[in-house]
């Protein structure tokens, strides 16, 4: 295993070196995104305050203090000094998203027309307008939510509609490779049919279904109207064509990622921090996967082109994902400097929607959506324990954040069903900054375990792990 890891790392390094011009341009764009966001945050923050788009830090004030401030604000009795002390600019995600989209669009133009991406519409970046449109729609939806406070049922519908541009331009495989145990079960139960062909006659005009023995590399195939829906190889691996069902899965992935970042929030820096950790893990994954540049899996060499594309992780997929992830890390790092404890700006729903969409879109573009779900393990856990409140089985307040104790300046368990309160329940009261770092440590551990599952434990389910 050690020798294999060394060899894979060497191949990844060679692949990165081969694509150094493109990766260098992406890195340059990421630096520009970081510097530009850092430069404009103070100006945009003042503009948002002037437009009365601000919030009060719940974890640094009591309910009585917030009500008193709101009453003074309505009566026009708030002094400027008091206002500047209490009010924190909100929805800075709109600036971050705008800077990100500007940089990515410029990078796409440069890569397409300066020779790095090839010529014509067949270059790997020609399909990016769809993903970028989805990111734009989600960003604007988040800003609308900041201003109008959209209800949850409407959020689900709108995020589903926002994922349509991505789904319409998706050019990847619609097949799923199942573990070997799945195929071996079929082999053991249907072994008596190995040397036979079974033709099922159908009325004229109806689809014809055939079970056929094929080439040695593909032991069993289930075909309807020349479309292979199930293929099982001699090794036992099964490739199942899902078609439109897979597109529904991708849409649901966008909905989940967008809202999961949004509900794991409430303390300074946690939204941006978790997004940065997942994005960095995704970058590492894509760089490592570049070692497979134009390598085909022998067991599936005879399958159709769509199946081959699913197993042939060419660098085109990774470069597109890195193009989306690099500038995102840049703008998020700049926002982190202002949003970490003590927060000088709030990111708002515009950032959480934007961040979740970028991570989902990059995984779909880079063909690693299942691996992304491993990185999202804390968000999945937080979502599962939140279900009783999200479905109103138990009372659900508007803000499910921990309770702030003004005497100790610590956060305590508010008995809401979130991972933040689980940590406080297990380890006791914490300072807000310490709680944020505890969440980020959990996120790092989840990403490391995700790599272990992806490259080590999956070997027990698949004959070949790439």
UniProtKB/Swiss-Prot annotation:
GO terms for biological process: dolichol-linked oligosaccharide biosynthetic process. It catalyses: a di-trans,poly-cis-dolichyl phosphate + UDP-N-acetyl-alpha-D-glucosamine = an N-acetyl-alpha-D-glucosaminyl-diphospho-di-trans,poly-cis-dolichol + UMP. Mg(2+) binds at residues 262, 349. InterPro entries: Glycosyl_transferase_4, GPT. Inhibited by natural nucleoside antibiotic tunicamycin, which acts as a structural analog and competitor of UDP-GlcNAc. It is a multi-pass membrane protein. It is found in: Endoplasmic reticulum membrane. Its EC number is 2.7.8.15. UDP-N-acetyl-alpha-D-glucosamine binds at residues 57, 90, 268, 398-400. Pathway: Protein modification; protein glycosylation. Glycans are attached at residues 59, 416. Belongs to the glycosyltransferase 4 family. In Leishmania sp., tunicamycin-resistant variants are associated with increased levels of NAGT gene transcription due to gene amplification. UDP-N-acetylglucosamine--dolichyl-phosphate N-acetylglucosaminephosphotransferase that operates in the biosynthetic pathway of dolichol-linked oligosaccharides, the glycan precursors employed in protein asparagine (N)-glycosylation. The assembly of dolichol-linked oligosaccharides begins on the cytosolic side of the endoplasmic reticulum membrane and finishes in its lumen. The sequential addition of sugars to dolichol pyrophosphate produces dolichol-linked oligosaccharides containing fourteen sugars, including two GlcNAcs, nine mannoses and three glucoses. This is UDP-N-acetylglucosamine--dolichyl-phosphate N-acetylglucosaminephosphotransferase. It comes from Leishmania amazonensis.
